[in-house]
Amino acid sequence: MSRYYTKKDRRINIEFRPSTKATAHGGQMAINAVAGEFGLWERVRSEPRLDPRRHKGKGFEPVVYVTALLFSFTSGGDSLADAERLEDDESLKMLLGVKKLPDQSAIGEWLRNVGEEGAEALREIIHDFCGWALNKADRGRLLLGGELEWFFDDTQIEVNGKKFEGSAINYNGDLALSWQTLWAGPFMCDAVLGTPADHKFAPESCAHGKDVSAWMPEMLERCAPLGKGFTSHLYADSASSAGHYLECIEEGFKHFTVSYNKWVGPLETQAAELPEMAWS
């Protein structure tokens, strides 16, 4: 690619109108403003791990790829094809200060070329944004009972096809991807997509895709700085109730709630032996 594309700042005049006359681009401009206040565009430009180009004066700057993905996701998109469709929105490109947006093939190639180092750079930027936003938010709207709520969960995304990279037969017998996520307040501050067996420290059960909390300890360690200055409470489901996970949780949280609906057979047998007065 011989041409060079970047993102420029645009001077925008804000006008408040009734909802019957609101523009569809209003929310996108708000996203652009928040990203600018955080310093996202400068951060992306200064991150060498996000720029795999050999010739820096040619092609799309990394900030253009990030722009395409960010405004696709925040406009309801869920695929690289959706990001490509933004190229047809001339008014949006003008407002964002981009002359051209990459197609899905170019975005996919960029994601592959930045590799694990680039993914780590994006993760660091996301962590910093979450910390920045948490500290700017009104505490009354952010906290519940004076606590910042955290949530760890694994979502099983069922897939089908001859080959689906990263998928495995899960505990329910379905071919699925494991999407392990960690939330701090309203922000998803960390996530890993793929079979739990991908984790180098995963226990043996991960070989069968059954341990769906394998990434939790690493996520909690990476995101621990986000809880500074807050009283935090972590919620997790029964998949995180194994002893080594509880120890990890106790190290980072004074308050936590972990549901326990596995391996209850022995407990139910013991409970049945207790007299009725024990439950009154």
Outline where the language-model segments fall:
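An internal, acidic/charged active-site-proximal segment
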Residues: 201-280
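Dynamic "connector" segments at or just before major functional cores
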Residues: 1-206, 212-228, 252
